[in-house]
UniProtKB/Swiss-Prot annotation:
Glycans are attached at residues 29, 62. This is Endothelin-1 receptor. GO terms for cellular component: cell periphery; nuclear membrane; plasma membrane; T-tubule. The gene is Ednra. GO terms for molecular function: endothelin receptor activity. Predominantly expressed in vascular smooth muscle cells of a variety of issues, bronchial smooth muscle cells, myocardium, and the pituitary gland. It is a multi-pass membrane protein. It comes from Rattus norvegicus. It is found in: Cell membrane. Pfam families: 7tm_1 (PF00001).
Length: 426
């Protein structure tokens, strides 16, 4: 609880400092620009904005430049504060929801199994993003500049911020793929029954997911630097992707397609493939001789499969608008078009919506589990309302993978014993 209070205090101080700094230094021009706001893990500085220019894109002496919009983009200050309120809500819900989800899986031994371990890994990645990246995003949006942009700590944040963003999304994507594979493996190996615990193969998968996510995020930490530039007679520094090598130039050129293909399409394709195979397995089992004996067994696993499928669908809905805006910027936007500034205003608005939806994905998974899974719903109610229920009853939760636990009210019978019958999910 002390840690949560510290994080909340840090968050409020950072946002408050951003509002004060914005009023003093950026009320004239920069308050309505969000060009250095990173809309996606690792997005470069000039993704949608064209007004604030890095040094190598400075205006020539005649004042003309391709891609430069003389007028401000049509994003009002009110919209920024609306976005800030949304981000604060996501911060609170995401921190409480993901922390509670981790606590549930950690404290209840019967919840420690393969799929729940992957869900815990997913929640931890979301929690890291919510706690570290969201405050920086809000500060940039309100202050119009990078936090601590004139000292070494700002340089450290410039490296850490895109690295953790990309790592968090990678952890989400790879965990969703692993959950899809796990559901197919559970249905295909219906006859294998194990005790409560995390299988070794699942532990290896989780470690591999985190290592691979960190490796794929290394180019972000290498490429992002603090770059000084001049805008309307004022000196500024911001964090942006500055390609200085051939590899980084190639990475910057193909980055949008790489993000769309690996970080969006791959989990959807993986889910489609393994859920199709899982459906075929279930249809074959319906005609088998053990249909009656396995009906309850398969029913429980189908419920878990629906939960995982729900998480994948939510991921797709949250991230599609942002990826769409990136692809439109890559394919439709033309620096030579006279109407490019109107298009940029539309893309910037679309990008704001995409940012909020993508960020919402970091807090919505615990909510989805609460409504989709009865087991997790009981756990959340017991954990969040423990003070209210402590004197009335002792809630015992059922793991996702089909364990059925019989329990009675502690006041009615203090000698109640629990019997657990676990169906393996792996």
């Amino acid at each position: 609880m002390g840690v949560l209070c510290f994080l909340a205090s840090f968050w409020l101080a950072l946002v408050g400092g951003a509002i004060a700094d914005n009023a003093e230094r950026y009320s004239a021009n920069l308050s309505s620009h969000v060009e250095d706001f990173t809309p996606f893990p690792g997005t470069e500085f000039n993704f949608l904005g064209t007004t604030l220019q890095p040094p190598n894109l400075a205006l020539p002496s005649n004042g003309s430049m391709h891609g430069y919009c003389p007028q401000q983009t049509k994003i009002t200050t009110a919209f920024k504060y609306i976005n800030t309120v949304i981000s604060c809500t996501i911060f609170i819900v995401g921190m409480v929801g993901n922390a509670t989800l981790l606590r549930i899986i950690y404290q209840n031994k019967c919840m420690r199994n393969g799929p729940n371990a992957l869900i815990a890994s997913l929640a931890l990645g979301d929690l890291i993003y919510v706690v570290i990246d969201l405050p920086i995003n809000v500060f940039k949006l309100l202050a119009g500049r990078w936090p601590f942009d004139h000292n070494d700590f700002g340089v450290f944040l410039c490296k850490l911020f895109p690295f953790l963003q990309k790592s968090s999304v990678g952890i989400t994507v790879l965990n969703l793929c692993a959950l899809s594979v796990d559901r197919y493996r559970a249905v295909a190996s219906w006859s294998r029954v194990q005790g409560i615990g995390i299988p070794l193969i699942t532990a290896i998968e989780i470690v591999s997911i985190w290592i691979l996510s960190f490796i794929l995020a290394i180019p972000e930490a290498i490429g992002f630097v603090m770059v000084p530039f001049e805008y309307k007679g004022e000196q500024h520094r911001t964090c942006m992707l500055n390609a200085t090598t051939k590899f980084m130039e190639f990475y910057q050129d193909v980055k949008d397609w790489w993000l769309f293909g690996f970080y969006f399409c791959m989990p959807l394709v993986c889910t489609a493939i393994f859920y199709t195979l899982m459906t075929c397995e279930m249809l074959n089992r319906r005609n088998g001789s053990l249909r009656i004996a396995l009906s309850e067994h398969l029913k429980q696993r189908r419920e878990v499969a629906k939960t995982v499928f729900c998480l994948v669908v939510i991921f797709a809905l949250c991230w599609f608008p942002l990826h769409l805006s990136r692809i439109l910027k890559k394919t439709v936007y033309d620096e030579m078009d006279k109407n490019r500034c109107e298009l940029l205003s539309f893309l910037l608005l679309m990008d704001y919506i995409g940012i909020n939806l993508a960020t919402m994905n970091s807090c919505i998974n615990p909510i989805a589990l609460y409504f989709v899974s009865k087991k997790f719903k009981n756990c959340f109610q017991s954990c969040l309302c423990c003070c209210c229920h402590q004197s009335k009853s002792l809630m015992t939760s059922v793991p996702m993978n089909g364990t059925s636990i019989q329990w009675k009210n502690q006041e009615q019978n203090h000698n109640t014993e629990r019997s657990s019958h676990k169906d393996s999910m792996n």
